[in-house]
Every structure is written in structure tokens, then in C-alpha cells.
UniProtKB/Swiss-Prot annotation:
One of its GO terms (molecular function) is protein methylthiotransferase activity. Belongs to the methylthiotransferase family. RimO subfamily. SMART domains: Elp3. NCBIfam families: 30S ribosomal protein S12 methylthiotransferase RimO, MiaB/RimO family radical SAM methylthiotransferase. It is found in: Cytoplasm. [4Fe-4S] cluster 2 binds at residues 159, 163, 166. This is Ribosomal protein uS12 methylthiotransferase RimO. Keywords: 4Fe-4S, Cytoplasm, Iron, Iron-sulfur, Metal-binding, S-adenosyl-L-methionine, Transferase. GO terms for biological process: tRNA modification. It comes from Paraburkholderia xenovorans (strain LB400). Residues 13-128 form the MTTase N-terminal domain. GO terms for cellular component: cytosol.
Length: 461
């Protein structure tokens, strides 16, 4: 009996790498190579031994531009499969098009600097990752603890504010924004995995990019500023491709928020960038806000809320507040109640102030007794629930788009664009009578609203 011929080993994919430019570009190269090695690629020392070549360019002076263009041309001649990254990737020609694409139209892809995520995306597209039986057990979207149809997308870590009641900066540090390409890659992987709703979170979503001076990143060859407005636009465009939702949380009431509201109200992203803002106002009286060291204490918050509603009548505003903060007088608390009535906030949470170890608010004079703090919280919620009930009642008779979260013996439970998971209300959906109207978890369905209480809705498909 003849011996079975040995199975030839599968060749490990090889990537050639050319690094040009300054030490900052060198660090970018190191990060890309580190990621390539971590994913199982070999780094080839020659063009002809590589399956493709990555060229990290410099575009600072004319000599560097020419050197980079020459290196790209050499890589194309010697290998033929070239991905270009670095500063020259962001440079335009005299005609306004990309300089590299104009000179070397056969390159596979071009990115700007600091584009690890986008470079890896293009490498994966043209040279799939080597199979690893252990790593491949982990989905591209990562392991999630949420249901499959929605996920949280964290865009930054830390916070630059020093609110007196909060100790987050001491635990998580100052603001560090994630590179925009990394955020977009994660969002795309989540949508590809079946996620229908992305909930954008951070400690301060409005401040995204402040720490990097709104540096321009690149995604799929397009420049995107590391800035909330630009990121929301890019996420909205991506969500539209997958018929999905994007919901914004922890948005401080800065003027820049005015730029996001139109995306919710009109244009190609309407219905994808949800008309929903989670804005942690915390209080409404200027003296209390000053003691809290809230960053929005100088903003004309009520005027801004009214402007947002004029721009987007369907806007849902959720917020959280603190009742019984040290030094809060009854008059100041009444100002807060008046604000809730006038602003007509849709969803509201309130906490009775509680000292947190390490918070500077502990040093403030005027600490209130526990019973006063709790009594004010209860009065606050009574007013807030009255306002919420009036706004919710207006939805009865309307047909709303609902994302189904759960199926049970009584039908389904879902959420409208006005409701974030866990913290807002739900829609109780009657069982579908017709087979054509049956739904499952993760489906979007049109629901005719037939009833409401102060928090939730009831309806039928």
C-alpha cells in the first residue's frame, strides 16, 4: 500500500514594509507592523518575497514627497500590490484629487497618517488573515454582553472636566479620544455582525477629539475629523448602508451639538442618526451649577433646548439631575422644577445627592439632611413623570418604527427611536395575527400605538 503524500503546509502570508519620514511616522510603522505580527502575518524583507507591500510615506517637504512617490513606484514595479499610508496620503494634487492616486493609480488603497485601523482593513481585504483556530473563535465584532441586535460603541475614555461630585477623572484620567478609523472599523464590524442599533458612549461625547485638536483621520480613503459632528455623520452614513440606528449618549450641551441636530431632522441620515440626545444637565440653577463646576453653567441651556426642538420637532431629550446638592436652597430647587416643566424633557432620572469618597463636593458647606435630599428627589420625579406622561400620550394613534428586543407569550417588547435600552420605556407589542406580520428579536416593525401610561406604550403591528 502506498504511503499518503504529506500535506503541504499553508504558506504564511507575507507583507513587505517600507517606512519613510520622521520619528512620528516611524512609530506609526511600528504600530502597524506590531499588529501585522500579532495577527500572524510575516514581515518580508524583500518586495518579491511579499504578497503585498505597505509604504508609509512622508509629505513634509518636496524632497520627501518625491522620495515617497519613488518608493511607491518601485514597490509597484517590483511587487504590484501596494497599500500606501502616511502624511502623503492626505496630500492633494493641483487638480484637487489625491496626489498619490493621480501619480500611481494602480495602488490598492491610500490612507492618511495615524491610520492603523484603516491600514489593517485594507490588508485584510487584499490578503486575508492566516487561520488561527484559537483567535478565529473570537468574532470580528468582539465578544459582547448585550443582545446581538444592539451594542455600545465607546469613542473615548476619561474626562477633562472636574465636576465636584464626580471622581471619574481620578480613576480614568483625562480625555483620550479613540482614532476615528478605529471607531469606524469597530462600528462596521458590529453592523456586519447583525447589530441594528449602536449606542455611542463616552464620559463626554461632545468633547470627542479635543485632546488631539480634532486631528483628521481616514476611513476608506476619506478624511474624517476626530470631532463629534464629523464622526456622527460618518456613523450615520454607515448605519444607512445597513438600515441601522445610531443613538447618542452623554452629550454635553455645547454649541457644537447644534451641528448634529440637522442630521437627525433631515437629509440622508434621518432615521439612522436618531432624534435622541442624552444630555446630563444635572441642575438648572446657575449657583448650583457653579458649585458643581459643571462645564455648561454659562450656557443658555433653555434657549438651546428650544432651538433644538425647533430644528427637530421629533427630538427626544433624556437627562439626569441631582437633587439636594450641598447648599441647594428651596428657591434654587424650585428653579430646577420650573426648568423641567418648561423644557418638557421626555425622559428624566434623578438622584438624591450622596457623598462620594474622594469628591471635592464633600468639602462644600451646606450639606443637607438625608430626608431633605430624598424628599426633593421624590418631588422632582413627580413633576418629571407628569411632563413625561403628557409627551408620551401624544404618541397614541401614531404608527412608530420599533426595534424588537424580546418575544414572549404575550407578544413582543421593543423600543422606539425615543427609547434607549435599560433606561427608557418600552413598547408592548400584541402578537401578530397574520403570518406576514410575524416578527423576531432584532426586527424593525411598524407598530400602531394604541395605549400609553406614564412610561411605556402599547401597540400592534
Amino acid at each position: 500500500m502506498s504511503a499518503t503524500p504529506p500535506i503541504a503546509p499553508i504558506a504564511t502570508p507575507k507583507v513587505g514594509f517600507v517606512s519613510l519620514g520622521c520619528p512620528k511616522a516611524l512609530v506609526d510603522s511600528e504600530q502597524i507592523i506590531t499588529q501585522l505580527r500579532a495577527e500572524g502575518y510575516e514581515i518580508s524583507g524583500t518586495y518579491d518575497g511579499a504578497d503585498l507591500v505597505v509604504v508609509n510615506t512622508c509629505g513634509f517637504i518636496d524632497e520627501a514627497v518625491q522620495e515617497s512617490l519613488d518608493a511607491i513606484g518601485e514597490a509597484l514595479n517590483e511587487n504590484g500590490k501596494v497599500i500606501v499610508t502616511g502624511c502623503l496620503g492626505a496630500k492633494k494634487s493641483a487638480s484637487g484629487s489625491g496626489l498619490i492616486e493621480e501619480v500611481h493609480p494602480k495602488v490598492l488603497a491610500v490612507t492618511g497618517p495615524h491610520a492603523l485601523g484603516e491600514v489593517m482593513q485594507h490588508v485584510h481585504m487584499h490578503l486575508p488573515k492566516p487561520h488561527d483556530p484559537f483567535v478565529d473563535l473570537v468574532p470580528a465584532a468582539g465578544v459582547k454582553l448585550t443582545p446581538r441586535h444592539y451594542a455600545y460603541l465607546k469613542i473615548s475614555e476619561g474626562c477633562n472636566h472636574r465636576c465636584t461630585f464626580c471622581i471619574i477623572p481620578s480613576m480614568r484620567g483625562d480625555l483620550v479620544s479613540r482614532p476615528v478609523a478605529d471607531v469606524m472599523l469597530e462600528a462596521e464590524n458590529l453592523f456586519k455582525s447583525g447589530v441594528k442599533e449602536l449606542l455611542v458612549i463616552s464620559q463626554d461625547t461632545s468633547a470627542y477629539g479635543v485632546d488631539v485638536k480634532y486631528r483628521t483621520g481616514f476611513w476608506n480613503g476619506k478624511p474624517i475629523k476626530t470631532r463629534m459632528t464629523d464622526l456622527v455623520g460618518a456613523l450615520g452614513e454607515l448605519a444607512a448602508q445597513y438600515g441601522a440606528w445610531v443613538r447618542l449618549h452623554y452629550v454635553y450641551p455645547y454649541p457644537s451639538v447644534d451641528e448634529v441636530i440637522p442630521m437627525m431632522a433631515e437629509g440622508p441620515f434621518k432615521g439612522h442618526v436618531l432624534p435622541y440626545l442624552d444630555v446630563p444637565f444635572q441642575h438648572a440653577h446657575p449657583e448650583v451649577l457653579k458649585r458643581m463646576k459643571r462645564p455648561a453653567n454659562a450656557e443658555k441651556v433653555m434657549e438651546r433646548v428650544k432651538k433644538w426642538r425647533e430644528m427637530c420637532p421629533d427630538l427626544t431629550i433624556r437627562s439626569t439631575f441631582i437633587a439636594g446638592f450641598p447648599g441647594e436652597t428651596e428657591e434654587q430647587f424650585q428653579t430646577l422644577l420650573d426648568f423641567i416643566r418648561e423644557a418638557e424633557l421626555d425622559r428624566v432620572g434623578c438622584f438624591a445627592y450622596s457623598p462620594v469618597e474622594g469628591a471635592t463636593a464633600n468639602e462644600l458647606d451646606g450639606a443637607l439632611p438625608d430626608e431633605v435630599r430624598e424628599e426633593r428627589r421624590a418631588r422632582f420625579m413627580e413633576v418629571a413623570e407628569e411632563v413625561s406622561a403628557k409627551r408620551i400620550a401624544k404618541k397614541v394613534g401614531k404608527t412608530l418604527k420599533v426595534l424588537v428586543d424580546e418575544i414572549n407569550a404575550d407578544g413582543g417588547i421593543g423600543r422606539t427611536a425615543a427609547d434607549a435600552p435599560e433606561i427608557d420605556g418600552v413598547v408592548y407589542i400584541a402578537p401578530a395575527v397574520k403570518a406576514s406580520k410575524r416578527y423576531k428579536v432584532g426586527d424593525f416593525v411598524s407598530v400602531k400605538i394604541t395605549g400609553a401610561d406614564g412610561h411605556d406604550l402599547w401597540g400592534e403591528v
